[in-house]
C-alpha cells in the first residue's frame, strides 16, 4: 500500500506523532503480533445458543480469544477491510480487551510509533531484494524484514 506508506512517512517527517500512532495501530490491525490470547474455560458454557453455530465448551477446555479475527469482523468493526487510521480506539484489540487487557498496552501506545519513526523518516524506503525483503515469521510472530533506503 504505497499511498498508506507515504502518508505514514509524511506524519513521521512532520513529527505528527498522534497521526503516526494511528497509522501504526491500523496497520497492526491487519497483521497483529498475535492472533489472540489462550484462555481456559472456568465452567461449562454454551456459545451462540439456539443458532446454527451453537457450541458447547467444557470447563477446563483451552479456548482462543481471537481478537485478530474480531478486528476484521464486520459485526464488530465498520468496513474492516478498509485501511482507516481514524477508527475509534475501541476497534483495536491488539492487547486483549476488558478485564484481561494487557497492561503493556499503554507502554506500546506511547512507544511503538516512536520506534518506527526514524525508519519512516528515511527517503526511498523499500524492502530489500530477494528473500531478505520478505517478512519472515516464527508462527504468528514477525522475526525479520530487511529494508533499504537512500
Residue ranges: model-predicted function:
Residues 1-150:
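Cytochrome P450
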Amino acid at each position: 500500500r504505497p499511498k498508506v506508506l507515504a502518508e505514514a512517512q509524511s506524519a513521521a517527517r512532520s513529527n505528527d506523532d498522534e497521526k503516526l500512532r494511528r497509522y501504526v495501530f491500523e496497520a497492526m490491525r491487519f497483521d497483529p503480533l498475535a492472533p489472540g490470547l489462550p484462555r481456559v474455560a472456568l465452567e461449562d458454557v454454551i456459545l451462540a445458543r439456539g443458532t446454527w453455530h451453537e457450541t458447547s465448551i467444557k470447563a477446563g477446555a483451552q479456548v482462543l480469544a481471537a481478537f485478530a479475527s474480531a478486528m476484521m469482523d464486520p459485526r464488530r468493526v465498520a468496513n474492516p477491510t478498509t485501511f482507516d487510521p481514524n477508527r475509534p480506539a475501541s476497534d483495536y484489540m491488539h492487547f486483549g480487551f476488558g478485564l484481561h487487557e494487557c497492561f503493556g498496552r499503554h507502554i506500546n501506545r506511547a512507544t511503538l510509533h516512536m520506534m518506527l519513526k526514524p525508519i519512516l523518516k528515511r527517503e526511498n524506503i523499500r524492502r530489500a531484494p530477494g528473500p531478505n525483503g520478505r517478512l519472515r515469521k516464527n508462527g504468528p510472530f514477525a522475526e525479520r524484514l530487511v529494508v533499504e533506503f537512500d
